[in-house]
């Protein structure tokens, strides 16, 4: 199974989610699930935000080498689940032809921390971890 974490720019929420998911999967010894991340409006090649990297580093995750990536049609066909940060992301995915049954929208939605201070990114990181753990328990 492949889970793609989807946000807007792929510089904050989705790369944080990807790293957190990998950490959780490792903790749970789940080897049958892969994860990735992409943005719906990413500027390909942009680095993660400094505060996203710092918030992840605080919990032992290094996302500093991540570069933004726009969701491709190939991934849209090969991913099993699209974990959307907000209902708006889910809507865009549906409009792009992704079947509804492949879309999981975070509940509650994960607000965009872009431009916020480190505390905002910490709150985002913690909300992501809670949402990802809850989702993985459903599988």
Functional labels for PLM-detected ranges:
Residues 81, 87-139:
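Phosphate-binding/catalytic loops
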Residues 15, 86-87:
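Alpha-helix N-cap/helix-start capping motif
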């Amino acid at each position: 199974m492949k889970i793609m974490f989807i946000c807007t720019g792929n510089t904050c929420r989705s790369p944080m989610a990807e790293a957190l998911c990998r950490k959780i999967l490792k903790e749970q010894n789940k080897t049958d699930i892969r994860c990735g991340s992409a943005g719906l409006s990413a500027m390909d090649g942009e680095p993660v935000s400094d505060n996203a990297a710092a918030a992840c580093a605080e919990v032992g995750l290094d996302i500093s080498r991540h570069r933004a990536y726009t969701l491709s049609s190939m991934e849209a066909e090969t991913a099993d689940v699209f974990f959307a940060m907000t209902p708006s992301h889910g809507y865009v995915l549906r409009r792009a032809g992704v079947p509804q049954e492949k879309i999981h929208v975070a509940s509650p939605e994960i607000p965009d921390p872009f431009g916020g201070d480190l505390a905002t990114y910490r709150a985002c990181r913690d909300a992501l971890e809670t949402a990802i753990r809850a989702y993985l328990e459903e599988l």
